[in-house]
């Protein structure tokens, strides 16, 4: 038996060191969450209805969406002048009020810039002069995301590493990450890629709707590189070194496979759906889904009706569920699925998923299909956080010098 004289009781919180107090507060909060869950289970008459499952998951685990185009919406409609508007209520598909209704806990904001028009006097499949302008515009889009967090500090929290998401969630903040959507935005320069990373960009889509010097686009591309160019292989390895996520959405199947051959990180698609459900070039083929499983990666399912259904006008929330179920069937689990709605970058929406407030309805639908709380939590955000952390850890383990060539094409 341990005597009272030898039993070391914890000091009152106000007498503990700051770091110890912080750790204790986190532990107490975790304990409260566990007790809350036990309380749910302990009520003899409690029934886990689909609605209760969905609510439990979305209030205990951060929902992280892989792709939202609010920044370009703000540019095109308001010239990025945030002081002239309120982000609480906007006429598009995303605003603070509806993000809260949708229980969004984290968002990868796309700092998208359109592909430059090709030079009719050049035989190249890219326009380097136009790409230089895209670099400038990308910096402006990064800035607008940072100003979102500056002007709404109780809502948005700039987040540059995966471990911060859980703490943002506990503070009721929406983790705000950034991704560039096409390597035309770096104008052939790995140094620009590195500077974007230092500014907070955490994924880069290899191509948008145009080929670039690195990779081929699935839509409006010309198969210029027949997948990845030699420079593209180098840039994928540089992204691995940085700990930046390699995003394969928008790319051709050849590009997907070749990138997975080169990359040491898990496969990642920020906003793509299943080609096995609808044969659209923006979707992921089944043979690539197998590789997603092999690399322990994730496909963030897109909601755009034109990508998910041969009859876009008839697309519904159930259409999105079918894509999710197909990916689960091919990969053998729900471990490789996330959500990348593409809101404010799409001109039509599925019935039942009209805006960012509708995520709870999607989780109810998934719960009705028999998904467990663990599986729902995986789809909500645990899968993408796993992929992100693995990518970060691999970056820390790569001890190579930065890629030093500049625009050598």
Curated annotation (Swiss-Prot):
It comes from Schizosaccharomyces pombe (strain 972 / ATCC 24843) (Fission yeast). PROSITE patterns: RENAL_DIPEPTIDASE_2. It catalyses: an L-aminoacyl-L-amino acid + H2O = 2 an L-alpha-amino acid. Interacts with dil1. InterPro entries: Metal_Hydrolase, Pept_M19. Its EC number is 3.4.13.19. Belongs to the metallo-dependent hydrolases superfamily. Peptidase M19 family. This is Uncharacterized dipeptidase C3A11.10c. Its cofactor is Zn(2+). Zn(2+) 1 binds at residues 67, 69, 181. GO terms for biological process: proteolysis. It is an enzyme of class 3 (hydrolase).
């Amino acid at each position: 038996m341990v005597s009272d004289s030898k039993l070391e009781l914890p000091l009152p919180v106000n007498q503990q060191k700051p770091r110890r107090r912080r750790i204790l507060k986190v532990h107490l909060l975790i304990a409260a969450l566990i007790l809350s869950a036990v309380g749910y289970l302990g009520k003899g008459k409690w029934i886990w209805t689909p609605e209760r499952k969905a609510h439990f998951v979305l209030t205990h685990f951060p929902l992280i969406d892989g792709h939202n185009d609010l920044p370009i919406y703000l540019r095109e409609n308001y010239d990025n002048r945030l002081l002239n508007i309120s982000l609480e209520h906007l006429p598009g598909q995303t605003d603070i009020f509806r993000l809260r209704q949708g229980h969004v806990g984290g968002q990868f904001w796309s700092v998208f810039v359109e592909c430059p028009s090709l030079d009719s006097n050049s035989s190249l499949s890219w326009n380097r002069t136009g790409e230089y302008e895209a670099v400038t515009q990308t910096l402006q889009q990064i800035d607008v995301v940072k100003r979102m967090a500056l002007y709404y500090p109780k809502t948005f929290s700039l987040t540059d590493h995966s471990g911060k998401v859980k703490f943002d969630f506990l503070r009721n903040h929406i983790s705000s990450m950034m991704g560039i959507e096409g390597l035309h935005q770096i104008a052939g320069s790995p140094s620009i890629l590195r500077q974007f990373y230092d500014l907070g960009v955490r994924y880069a889509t290899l191509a948008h709707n145009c080929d670039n010097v690195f990779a081929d686009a699935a839509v409006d591309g010309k198969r210029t590189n027949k997948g990845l160019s030699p420079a593209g292989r180098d840039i994928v390895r540089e992204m691995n070194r940085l700990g930046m996520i390699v995003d394969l959405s928008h790319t051709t199947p050849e590009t997907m496979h070749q990138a997975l051959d080169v990359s040491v990180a898990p496969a990642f698609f920020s906003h793509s759906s299943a080609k096995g459900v609808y044969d659209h070039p923006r979707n992921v083929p089944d043979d690539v889904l197998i590789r997603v499983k092999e690399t322990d990666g994730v496909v963030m399912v897109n909601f755009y009706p034109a990508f998910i259904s041969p009859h876009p006008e008839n697309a519904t929330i159930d259409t999105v569920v079918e894509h999710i179920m197909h990916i689960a069937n091919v990969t053998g689990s729900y471990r490789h699925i996330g959500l990348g709605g593409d809101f404010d970058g799409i001109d039509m929406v599925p019935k039942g998923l009209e805006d960012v407030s509708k995520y709870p309805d999607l989780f109810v639908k998934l719960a009705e299909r028999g998904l467990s709380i663990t599986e729902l939590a995986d789809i909500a955000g645990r899968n993408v956080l796993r992929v992100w952390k693995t990518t970060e850890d691999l970056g820390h383990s790569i001890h190579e010098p930065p890629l030093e060539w500049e625009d050598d094409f």
